[in-house]
A protein has these predicted regions:
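Phosphate/dinucleotide-binding and metal-coordinating scaffold of catalytic cores
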Residues: 22-342
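Bacterial Sec-dependent N-terminal signal peptides
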Residues: 1-23
Length: 342
């Protein structure tokens, strides 16, 4: 009889553990799933607007959504105000959702996720947000050493009842430690390094990609809009560059994006290559990646139903110009060698 009850108890505990385990969101599948998540972030909007100048300010919130057909998420989370320019300029600042302090949260295994939202809740800014989301998805096609993202239709609900609910698109970004882990790497904890001290081929991929999207708002030496990771099996090897934050790119073309006057261009839509010179052989090796992924890139753009036909057409026209450049040998030499950084 004792053995019967002992066995029954074990079965009950096993079943409970199985059910409990199923409540956690898988940190890998979360970003491989491409479906749109309808979610609500309940917080004190009035307070966040009053305190948004305080970078690192943390306050409580509730993140709710439905995952698949069965899991209703209602996580208590800590929300941190982050960002620099967008934190001060935009109506709602960028946030970080922190789950690691709540083991009962469905998103616990994802630890913390950056939340990227529209600058001001208007239709044009919503389209810009979707364009920045697309940039991450496109870069995923170019290299695995990239941040993965998940699109949300997000409602900001004020728990004080003093502000109207705001609904807009937003996206969640993978943590850099997860980027490193799935690439058999670790987060770089060494000193800041010069551009040419990073992995040469990966740096070439990054520089060409930034040129592709018309983005000059990045710098390796000052860790501006880039993260570094290094190979686990060789901590002394050159680190790999992982870019992020693309709202200043010509691809997105936000109203607040203005180029550095030292670049000699009038609009962020004008491309400037910010990489260092490479041999034609090195360039052809990297440009071949972009050419092989062209059809997939264009398919990714056209498959995003939340973008208008006009927005898609503008993006494709902008990328067509890039592809004309990289498939013209004289343009390749002029752009990536002659006019490269010294």
């Amino acid at each position: 009889m004792k053995s019967f009850f002992a066995g029954a108890f074990i079965l009950i505990i096993s079943a409970f553990n199985s059910i409990y385990a199923q409540q956690f969101i898988d940190r890998v599948n979360f970003f491989t799933d491409t479906s749109l998540i309808n979610a609500t972030l309940t917080l004190n909007i009035k307070k966040i607007l009053a305190e948004k100048e305080k970078e690192g300010y943390i306050f409580p919130a509730t993140f709710s959504c439905k995952m698949g057909d069965s899991l209703n998420v209602n996580d208590q989370v800590s929300v941190e105000v982050r960002g620099h320019f967008r934190r001060t300029y935009c109506y709602l600042p960028p946030l970080k959702l922190i789950y690691k302090n709540n083991p009962a949260a469905a998103f616990y295994r994802l630890k913390s996720l950056k939340l990227v939202n529209t600058c001001v809740p208007t239709f044009s800014n919503d389209q810009n947000l979707l364009k920045e989301f697309l940039i991450y998805k496109i870069y995923n096609l170019i290299t695995d050493k990239s941040f993965r993202v998940r699109l949300l239709n997000l409602s900001y609900k004020d728990n004080s009842g003093k502000k109207k609910t705001i609904t807009q698109h937003a996206f969640l970004m993978e943590d850099i430690k997860e980027v490193a882990k799935r690439n058999n790497c670790a987060d770089w904890t060494g000193k800041k390094c010069n551009t040419e001290s990073t992995d040469r081929r990966q740096m070439t991929i990054v520089a060409v990609f930034e040129y592709m999207i018309g983005n000059t708002d990045w710098s390796v030496p000052v860790n501006h809009n880039i993260k570094l990771i290094h190979a686990n099996n060789d901590p002394m090897s050159s680190p790999f560059v992982v870019p992020y934050d693309f709202d200043y790119s010509g691809f997105v073309n936000t109203s607040y994006a203005v180029p550095d006057e030292r670049l000699g261009i009038e609009s962020v839509r004008e491309r400037v290559y910010r990489g260092f010179p490479r041999t034609m052989e090195e360039l052809n090796d990297v440009l071949d990646i972009f050419n092989k992924q062209k059809a997939n890139i264009y398919a990714t753009i056209n498959s995003l139903n939340t973008l208008t036909a006009e927005t898609k057409s503008g993006i494709i026209d902008y990328l067509d110009d890039f592809y004309r450049t990289i498939n013209n040998p004289s343009s390749v030499k002029r752009t990536f060698i002659t006019n490269a950084r010294e």
